[in-house]
């Protein structure tokens, strides 16, 4: 098992900001189309974070043209260029799956105040 731990440690990213459920993030994703590559930004609210180490993932939800879109990202994926935290959310839950049923202003998350 020690060899697997070393391989896992080698593939961990170091430049990941601290974020949790309720935070609004911008995820910069590298997309390769044929011979060209471009960066696509996916901005939304983190509704869940699960796993640990190399297998850690997080789910981001956004509303696009009145349709909810959720995307799951591995935290340490080489496809992710960078993760920016836009705002910090003030929530009391680790998983915000209840946001799927809420519409409009009810789906808004309060911003955490800095003291």
Swiss-Prot record:
- Highest taxon, organism lineage: Bacteria
**Can you name this protein?**
Large ribosomal subunit protein bL19
What PROSITE patterns does the database record attribute to this sequence? RIBOSOMAL_L19 (PS01015)
Q: Name the InterPro entries on file.
A: Ribosomal_bL19, Ribosomal_bL19_CS, Ribosomal_bL19_sf, Translation_prot_SH3-like_sf
Xref: HAMAP family: Ribosomal_bL19
The entry's function note states: This protein is located at the 30S-50S ribosomal subunit interface and may play a role in the structure and function of the aminoacyl-tRNA binding site.
Q: Which UniProt keywords apply?
A: Ribonucleoprotein, Ribosomal protein
Q: Which Pfam families match?
A: Ribosomal_L19
State whether keyword ATP-binding applies.
no
Write out the transmembrane intervals: none
| GO molecular-function terms, A-Z | structural constituent of ribosome
One cellular component (GO) term of this entry: cytosolic large ribosomal subunit
As for family, the record states: Belongs to the bacterial ribosomal protein bL19 family.
- Extract the SUPFAM superfamilies matched here: Translation proteins SH3-like domain
Which BP terms from GO are recorded?
translation
